């Protein structure tokens, strides 16, 4: 299941996201959307978790929590309309 993660600090790295999500199960991939400024992200990204039950638990427990002073949004990723 692909999970959207928003409200991240721009200087966060994938290891920081992994630390939060691996508590809930297996992670297939983590993608932080890069900013034009090297070494920074755009404040959002995606986590892929193959087990739907683990993914749903991560979403319900991580959505709305505060990390490093910022409230994050965690939800099921949806396809963008073209």
Task: Write out the residue ranges for each language-model feature.
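Intrinsically disordered, low-complexity RNA-binding regions enriched in Gly/Arg/Ser/Tyr
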Residues: 1-42, 48-82
């Amino acid at each position: 299941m692909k999970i959207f993660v928003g409200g991240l600090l721009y200087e966060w790295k994938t290891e920081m996201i992994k630390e939060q999500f691996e508590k809930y199960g297996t992670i297939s991939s983590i993608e932080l959307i890069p900013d034009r400024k090297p070494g920074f992200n755009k404040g959002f990204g995606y986590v892929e978790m193959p087990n739907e039950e683990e993914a749903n638990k991560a979403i319900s427990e991580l959505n709305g929590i505060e990390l490093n002073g910022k409230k994050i949004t965690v939800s099921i990723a949806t396809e963008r309309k073209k």
